[in-house]
Amino acid sequence: MTIRPAERHDIPAIVRLLKLSLGEELIPKSEDYWRWKHIDNPFGVSPVLLAFENETLIGVRAFMRWKWQMGQNVYETVRAVDTATHPDHQGKGIFKKLTLMLLEQCKKEGVNFVFNTPNQSSKPGYLKMGWQVAGKLPVSIKFEKPASIILHAAGLKTNSQTRIDVSNSLTYFLDHPNLDGLIAKDRANQTFISTQPSVEFLRWRYKQVKVVEYFAAGFETNNLLRALVLYRIKPGKVGKELRVTDIFMESATYRREATTLITDSVKLHNAEYMTVSTNHQWIFSGILSLNALKIGPVVTIRDVMNGPMEKLQNFREWSPSLGDLELF
């Protein structure tokens, strides 16, 4: 078996192996999606290792680059994402070998920590390699239509196929001349570890992605963008979920306006319920009543080099949004 870093000409073979090993799952696998995720990412090209038996690709392991910040501190991190082993070569330790080799490479590059949201079948393998459970991402929920939710759950109602065309608002707000200023002011007020965003990042994350459609709602005064909410609509077994993926505010002064953007969007899309990271719950305090539920993904972490691990545990000083952790 030979192991080497992936190159761009390997993408078709990588995608074929992912489909062979994992199937399509929820997110369709394609060369375009791989390029968006691992090459076009503003945080940098993903480190990827490939394993070959003769000329046959039998293993792939990819980490995705991410930057978190807290005040003036910036943490260089990676997210353990795509991995696949050829069905004829499973049980040979390929997943573990590639993962540990990639961790060593990341350590040499000065990466601080690695994080991911493993499923139940892969989590034990990560824990054996030194990962720790940080906890379940706390998610808050607002039930808008309890009766409709019950009907959906009982199979007596199905999701409407009517599409609300408000996609132009996403382009408008992501091209807003004041967006950069809003991002800077929002992050200046942050007291937790949060993603280091930029206009380029938001356009990549929410506009250039092809597998999910996102929407935006903003509040402006005097041609200045004061608050921005990014979200998506996710049909499910109990009705339509409006998932708030990111919120940016010039200051806490605009909490009420940000809340109104969300409640108006829920009505616009006729959603049964709304979800948001509990880390954002302070925005709605005294304005909107939310229920905190343990329905978020389990997040695991591993120190690579001088990571702020105590701050990450139980999200003590770590504030991922739903947009940070979903989809990837």
Explain the meaning of each model-derived region.
Residues F63-W68, T83-T85, P118-S121, N279:
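An acidic- and aromatic-residue-enriched active-site/binding cleft used to recognize and process polar
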Residues M1-I3:
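Extreme N-terminal starter segment of soluble prokaryotic enzymes
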Residues N112-T162, T221, L230-F328:
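Active-site/acyl-donor-binding loops of N-acyltransferases
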Residues E53-I58, A62-G71, Y231-K237:
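Acetyl-CoA-dependent GNAT
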Residues L49, G59-R61, V78, T83, ...:
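Conserved GNAT-family N-acetyltransferase fold
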Residues V74-P87, G239-E250:
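Conserved acetyl-CoA binding element of GNAT-fold acetyltransferases
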Residues P12-I14, L18-V48, F52-E53, K107-E109, ...:
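Amide-forming acyltransferase catalytic core, primarily the GNAT-like/NAT-type
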Residues T85, Q90-E104, T253-D264:
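Conserved acetyl-CoA-binding loop-helix of GNAT-fold acetyltransferases
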